[in-house]
């Protein structure tokens, strides 16, 4: 028979357990409550400073180390092991706008005149800072170290409709161009947030591919024909890789994400998207356009969801953009731009504020701020 003392002690323990369970249920409800209309996408729960730093270090590590084999993989903090995941088709509707590559600011005369008058320009379509290393790049990591005042973002399809784009330069010719002397290649590492779902994939381009007569039908088998090249001869061709599904992320949570791209000549191209405590990666052969042979500039930003569209932020939004490179050097890279720079045809409604800073480090980087 239990003594009254032991019985009382057990009763107190039971009360404590019940109280902790009630508290846990309350906390869980708060963390996983149904999102509001303006925050329909993933929102990370708050963590303390030490845990936040640990998670940030994990995101940096995962962004720099993709899976060793082709395919789609995911990982969850704190594990650094990639687990095989299903690959899906990239969004069929997605196609980045083909920017002009010959005129000042992509052939937009109105844009050029406004620049000459000293007017601020919205980011994208030729108005942005890009990073350039002393030689070829083997990888870059894009992030947003500081995000303030952002409560909403709207794209052509609704709230949280945008892309994170990490783009290579598009003035290089590789063996993929065959004997077409005007042909150049371009590659985009993309995270697409499409209102309620997300995808991570790579889009490849061939510009001015084919014969000197714009007869059409010259794209390689399996590629999509984007029409006659507006600046040269031949056709513009594009194709998407497979994709890995990821959550849509609320624009207010951009400080928790990173997008990276890495290439190995004769090996694999890899893109990694990290979101809070989860990472998603896709790996394909570099031989698609052989971008490793010509990649020397990188553009990273948040812009519209393809087709030359815009990502529109609420008034009072400020975002700091960081683009860190791997180029075999610890020297400070070069800030290129903002005029006549960048490679995407998409935009946002923010303007560049202040200058671009370039910093040498184990992973050299540039950093700049945009706001409205």
Model regions and ranges:
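N-terminal secretory signal peptides that target proteins for export/translocation
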Residues: 1-10
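Intrinsic structural disorder/low-complexity segments
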Residues: 5, 17, 190-191
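Alpha-helical context
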Residues: 13-16, 118
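Bacterial N-terminal signal peptides
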Residues: 15-26
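Sec/Tat signal peptide C-region and signal peptidase I cleavage site
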Residues: 29-33
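Exposed, interaction-prone regions of secreted/extracellular proteins
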Residues: 34-372
